[in-house]
Each structure stands twice: as structure tokens, then as C-alpha cells.
Amino acid sequence: MAGFIGKERHSIDEKGRLMIPARFRRKFADAGSCDGGASEYGRFGALYVMKTSDGSLELYEPSVWEGMGKSISALSDFNPEERLLKTLMYECLEMVELDRQGRIPLSREFLEHAGISGEVVILGADTKMIVWEPARLRGVVDGSSGRFAALAGRYF
């Protein structure tokens, strides 16, 4: 099955909640991770939200995050670099539950990190969704447009 693909604009409501696009929520239902039944991830499913170094937020389904979490858990607490990586990863991570309307709450810390106060752009990026403040995303895209061909040539 195809992952998350596409781009949508949504608004953060006055309580800091973000509506997950219906087409992305349908992907959860198809995968069985958001069927409305009680589970360890809440009645309507959950997402892992991570702050990123580029100023965006990444949203992962539990099944995707579990694979990443296993890799992180395998790092040694006795190796200073590996322990630092664990600390940095978990410091920027939250798990949030979807409500009946398909919204997730975003903490003030995460909203401030991403510069979000109103409208957002949600990009489907295969195994994750990336949430951007629109002007910040436009700045990244405009500032990198000349690099697209070189990057694509290098990796494809």
C-alpha cells in the first residue's frame, strides 16, 4: 500500500489541535491502527510527533515508530554518544491520541518550535507526515529550488 502522499492546508484550533486530513486517516483505518475500537493507542488511534532540526514537526503512525524505537532502544546507555542520541530523540518526541474528529493536540512547546500559530501545511512523505508553518516551508522550498536537480541526480 502507498504511504502518505499529498499536501493539504489546515488550521490549528484555539486549543492547539490539528485536524489530520481524512485521506491520511483512511490510511490508518486501512492499516488497522485507527478502527474506533479500544487499543493501547486510544480509541481513535495515535501518532508520534517529533520536533525536527529544520523547524518542522514529523508525525508517525505507531507501527512505523515502533521500528524506529527498536533501533533507538538497541543503543547502549553506556556509550556516551549513543546515550546522547537517545536523550535527544526522546526529548523531542510526544505520543498524542486522535479524537473522534480526527484531531491531535499539539503542545505549546511543539507549536513554538515549528513557529505555528494558525495555518499549517501537512505534507504526506510516505512513512510520515511533515507539518510546516506555511511561510517557513516556502522559505525552505524557495531557498533550495536550485539544489533540487543536483540532489535528485545524486540520489536517483
Curated annotation (Swiss-Prot):
Pfam families: MraZ. GO terms for molecular function: DNA-binding transcription factor activity; transcription cis-regulatory region binding. Keywords: Cytoplasm, DNA-binding, Repeat, Transcription, Transcription regulation. GO terms for cellular component: cytoplasm; nucleoid. It is found in: Cytoplasm, Nucleoid. CDD domains: MraZ_C, MraZ_N. HAMAP family: MraZ. This is Transcriptional regulator MraZ. It comes from Chlorobium phaeovibrioides (strain DSM 265 / 1930) (Prosthecochloris vibrioformis (strain DSM 265)).
